[in-house]
Each structure stands twice: as structure tokens, then as C-alpha cells.
């Protein structure tokens, strides 16, 4: 596929947050609570959670941008977690809380991502498990209620999974946290969605207390706009849109940690529509992003640094190694491809504009966010660039290419 540059302008709506959708669908399924959910992106990760719900006996019907979950939970014999780290980790906590005996089938990529700290924490409550290549065998039949102890520094998803485990066990459940939670806003997102279904999550001095029962009353929700995906639209506007881009559907008080992008870049809110933000091409000041807190913002903001004299500072870049790809290495590879200057101290990665005449003919990243970053960089370079593996963008933002085309980029499939 070739993406050609252009002066982008216009309005788009942010895709629905996959973090919101996966949590809502899985909680609905495991609690047997009817759900209507709007603003669904139906990205690949969303579809994993939908298929898990179906394997658990729920009926899931879909329309253009919404879905309906109905039915009663049944213990599945097996489920497929695809490449979705969120669904994988959350469902481990949910299945353990339901005392299920189940096989979780994994992709090769997902099988290599961290899970053992969560399994070790749940094993203290009676979970037994075995990993055979691409299958995780879980036996929750011996699960007992009690405290869960989890390290928050590895992944916020481990903490969210522990909270969901306690909600399924019922009664009062305690989750004790050691070390600071990375991307802790996602735990708040889990807690707030869970509370809509009945259970309350209260933060304590050293963790969380989960109380209350599921009320099982039919629920109607709408997924927030996805700030992680919107980071690419903001970068495109700041680099390539003299007339400006407006993005709709972004909740200003979202629990998504990546809503912090609003404080990292120059953007303006729409007084008439509080969920809309505008960006336009301008000279940029230096941008800083902490990869420990906002790893998904590092790729789009790195692109801003690549075409800015002030540059972009990425703190704790080592946290980018544990994502779907080694984003630490990939971001540097992308920057070099466009002639950008790089300073890497290990604790801090600094990228800024370099040889403006350099650009690649072909980019071949394999991870969805790096592919999107490469596409925005190509447009900003002013040159047509070929991109492979673009089908992987559907993991998080299926309408990305059509949105860019609507804004004025040239998109041609070869």
C-alpha cells in the first residue's frame, strides 16, 4: 500500500476505546448482565472479547457501531485469546473467579508476553495452571476467597484482573498492591466500568477493596473515544494540517491514561462540543512522554519529534520492549529511516529533526501502532511511502486508513 502526502483537513470521530469495550463485554458476559454497548470500533481486540463471550454461552448481536450481550454464563471448555493482551489477562482473573476449568489458546506473539506474576498471585488462592506451548490450562476448582497480592509495576492489567477476580468471588475482596502501578488509570477504568454493573471498588492505603454484588439489571453504555488511537490523528494534524483537524467523541474527563495527550500537545477544545478537540500545523515546543505511564503514546509523539527542531523526549523507553513488538527498537528504526537525530541514554530517548531530505521507499513494521506511526511520518515527509502489513492496523483502529483518506491523504492499495 502507498500513502501519499497532502494538506490534511476536516473532521473525524475517534474510534471507540478498545480498553472500554473489552472490559464492558467481558464483565457483562461473566456476570450474566444484559448489555447494550455503543460506539464500538470492532477492532480485532474487540472481536476477541466478543468471541470469548460467545464461548461462555452468551448471545452477542452486532449492528453498525453497537452490540448487545444477552444470556447466562456457562463455563467454557476452551477460549481463544488471539493477540489481545488485555482480554487474555482480564479473562484469566475472571475465569479463576468463576472457578472454571478451561484451556486458553494463544497466538505465538501473545504466548511470549508476561502473565506469570498474575498466575502466581492467583495460585495463592488455589488456582492451578500449566503452560503447554500455545495453551494455558487453568483449573480454578480449588479457588478459595481471600486477599490477592500483586506487583503493580509489571502491568496494570494484572491489577485489573485481580479486581475482577474478587468481584466474581463475591463478598468483600482485598487486592494488595506492591510497588507503583504503571498506567494506573486503566485500573480506574476497570473499577468505574465494574461499578456500573454493581460491585464497588474503593482504593485503600495499599490496594483496593471490592464489595457488593452484581445487580444483573440491563445496562446501556457507550465506549469513550480512544485517546491512544487519537494520538495519531493529533500528530497528523500538528504536522500536516494548516487548516486544522477536529476530532470528535473524546470524553474530557476520561479514565484512559492516554487522555494525558491533551496536556502534552497544543490542542484546543470546542466550546460548543466538549468532546471535540482541534489541532493544526504549527512550530512545536519540546514534547515529553513517559513510556512507563503512556507507552501507546510513544509512537505518535515520537513522530512529532522526528519533524520538530524541539524534539520529543521519551522517558523510561525500556518499558516499550514488552509491548506487541520491541517498540524501543522500532521507534529508533523509524526515526533513522527519516534521517532524524537520536540520543539514547537508556533512561531517556531523545528524537528530533535531522536530515529533512531523507525518507524510506518502504516501511515494513509488524505492530499496529508502529505501522500507523510510519504512515503519519510518511505523510509528514511530503513523499509517497509504501507500507506493508497494513492489515494489522485493524487490531486497534480499523478505520484509520479511511479516516486519513477522508482528511485528504492519498491511500492506494497495490
Residue ranges and their predicted role:
Residues 1-414:
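Short, structured segments at the rim of ligand-binding sites
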